[in-house]
Amino acid sequence: MKLELLIPTSLDEIPLKHYQEFRKTVDTSNDAEFISEKMVQLFCGIELKDVVKIKATDLSDMIDHFNRIFAVKQTFKHRFKIGDIEFGFIPNLEQISWGEYIDAEKYLSSWDNMHKAMAVLYRPIKNTKGDKYEIIDYEGTGEYAELMKFTPVSIAMGASVFFWTLGLELLEALGDYLEKETKKMSKTTTANKRSLGNSGDGISQSMQQLKEIFSTSIESQNSPLLKH
């Protein structure tokens, strides 16, 4: 019997839940052959037992294909649909609540929880006017987290990079502001110069640590899918 494969042409066609399972396989297995088989099983929607029926040259071509589509930089999208529900990204991140920010940062740190992160950042649109829209209030991830497993992985990658990049920009702006304020304060009194200098050093170190966290998170989104 001839084996039929539906090979995704872009990350728009791969649901988040399949990529999460693939990432889990990569993190827990050192068997390159098994990882390759799981990749084809998950992304092409076939049984694992059928993967061994594929010609070796074809499998190698498929690995190259998936590496290429995962290497494409994903653009950030404000809105997308799952079934009949249209979801919108938080319209103004500068007005994000503390609860939203803490949950988003926590869940974005692990692909296992990326569906929960999507349930924080994207919520059902309740009103639309032109290009503007309103989303429902944030009340935790319980209601939509499971549904978000069907988010195209392209949406998840674009949103996570956007969030971390914006966070890095905000940190840099805050760091510049604090540095200027520290210099102003150090000029007001000679007596406090040493203590203020130490405080400034501490602030700089903390900012640098946070920047490294944001930068590492962004880089992890762009790592190669699979080597062979």
Outline where the language-model segments fall.
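Charged interaction scaffolds used for protein-protein
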Residues: M1-H228
